[in-house]
Amino acid sequence: MGEKSKGYVFIAIAGLLWATLGLFGKFLMGNGLASEQVAFTRLFFGFIVLGIYSSIRTPQILKISKKGIIYSVIIGIICQAMFNLCYFKAIDIVGVSIAAVLLYTSPLFLAIFSKVCYKENITRSKLFSLILCFIGAIMAVTGGRLDFQGLNAFGLLLGILSAIAYALMPTISKNALKEFSSSTILVYSFLFGAIFMIPSSKPWEILNYANNLDVLFCMLMLGIVPAALAYIFYATGISKGVELSVAGIVASVELVGSVIIGCTILGESFSLGKLFGVMLMLISAVVALNLSYDEIRIFYKSSKLKQIEKTESI
């Protein structure tokens, strides 16, 4: 297997690791943790693991200026804390598969933000891709039945808000990445996101689960698997020479993984309409192959890891 082929495998693994977000989150919430506490757990343990890994492999990326701290605080609050909070709340209310589908509407909001903030053109090809994504999302959420009465409106709103927070990452951080490594911003945004979550998550209450080894293990895995380890695998794939645009498409396996986990392990509803909707969303990602679609992954899918390519050989 060639180096680039290995890169594709690593990126696909990263996507599947991200897909476990809902699985770990659902287990923890099912054992009594609030969604705020689950969000805090992911950010806190993710920061610890990534911080340790970075200090061993590339300690220079932990150096940060006052300006970098300001960027990290803003991104940590808006794009990390708010994203995780909304996403886990959506998972708790509407389930893993629907929450994942709603999250993947983020390219729609990215296109709007890019147009408003940076005057980027929405070409016909990009518009076609976004329309496919929108139709696919509706099909996947409703199962092909245009009946929204059985759906929880608040849960859907939270899913959409998570997509908005997700799309705000490249919008807010575009200038920051001209001066700082995305890994630097990632580590510290996890830290400040966790700090911001302290008042609402009341992490000291999590100590009540100190005797529950299953919960403690799952909390640690939440910080390792869909957080630190997924980013490390993605960075490894990029370092093998995989094109950034192609990497964004390969990582879309996350959506498929999330739906499969939701429908099989967690027993969520499944229909041909939902399958068709997910397929449309994946097709929209392929259509966007030569567009700027993968900019949405600056942090969560790390498609801007150019600094790692230059400074780190994983």
Regions found by a protein language model. Give the residues of each.
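Specific transmembrane alpha-helical segments of multi-pass solute transporters/efflux pumps
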Residues: G51-S97, M139, G223-G241
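Hydrophobic transmembrane alpha-helices of multi-pass small-molecule transport proteins
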Residues: L50, S54, I122-G144, M197, ...
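Glycine-/small-residue-enriched transmembrane alpha-helix faces in small-molecule transporters
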Residues: M1-T41, F148-N175, I195, Y300-I314
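Hydrophobic alpha-helical transmembrane segments of multi-pass integral membrane proteins
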Residues: S5-I13, E36-I56, I74, S125-I135, ...
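C-terminal-most transmembrane helix of multi-pass membrane proteins
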Residues: L43, T142-G143, V215, S252-I314
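C-terminal transmembrane-helix exit sites in multi-pass transporters
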Residues: V49, S54, S106-I131, V256-L275
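Helix-helix packing/entry segments at the starts of transmembrane helices
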Residues: T41, Q80, A99-T105, S173-A194, ...
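Juxtamembrane C-cap of transmembrane helices in multi-pass membrane transport proteins
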Residues: L16-L33, F45, N84-V94, L102, ...
